[in-house]
Structure formats: structure tokens, C-alpha cells
């Protein structure tokens, strides 16, 4: 999957994605202990941050995790985690001039 990101954010993206990778590991840990509240909180944070950096898929998956945590739906959360892992392993980032973004 290819994502276009503003060149203005180029220096921030590696750190942001490292944080997302840590969040995904946290999701796995929270799911293993059925910590629905932390899953909800961190899903909400991912939902809020993804689009701001141009990663709308992260926003969608954050919302899925947040909503599923409210229902204690571990299967849906596990599915989202798997999709997030796959996404981060395959996403291609193209940095574009701000007026194009």
C-alpha cells in the first residue's frame, strides 16, 4: 500500500511509526490480559493521530480497536492487530510537496 505524506512531516514519520509499532505491541499485551480499558484508550489515540500524519488506515484500525474494546470483542481486536502488522510491513511512503498533499 502506498501513502502520500507531506514532505513537511518527513523528519517526524520514523519516530511516529516507531511509536505505532510500540502501540501495536501494547495492544497485543493488553489483549492477552483482556485489558479493555487500555485497548479503548490507545485505540482512540491511534484513531486521532493517524489521519493527522496521512495514515488514514491507522485511523480506521484505531477506531475498530476502540469500538471493539467497548464490547470486549477480542476477535475483532486481534483482526485489527494482524492488519496493522501487515500494513506496517508493506506500507510504502512517498513524500510530496505540501501543496500536493
Regions found by a protein language model. Name each.
Residues 2-3, 7-24, 49, 53-60, ...:
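Amphipathic, coiled-coil-like alpha-helical segments
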Amino acid at each position: 500500500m502506498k501513502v502520500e505524506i507531506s514532505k513537511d512531516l518527513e523528519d517526524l514519520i520514523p519516530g511516529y511509526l516507531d511509536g505505532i509499532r510500540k502501540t501495536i505491541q501494547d495492544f497485543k499485551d493488553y489483549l492477552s490480559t483482556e485489558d479493555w480499558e487500555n485497548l479503548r484508550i490507545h485505540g482512540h489515540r491511534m484513531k486521532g493521530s493517524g489521519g493527522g500524519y496521512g495514515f488514514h488506515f491507522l485511523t480506521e484500525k484505531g477506531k475498530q480497536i476502540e469500538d471493539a474494546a467497548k464490547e470486549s470483542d477480542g476477535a475483532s481486536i486481534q483482526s485489527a492487530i494482524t492488519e496493522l502488522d501487515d500494513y506496517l510491513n508493506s506500507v510504502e511512503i512517498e513524500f510530496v510537496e505540501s501543496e500536493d498533499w
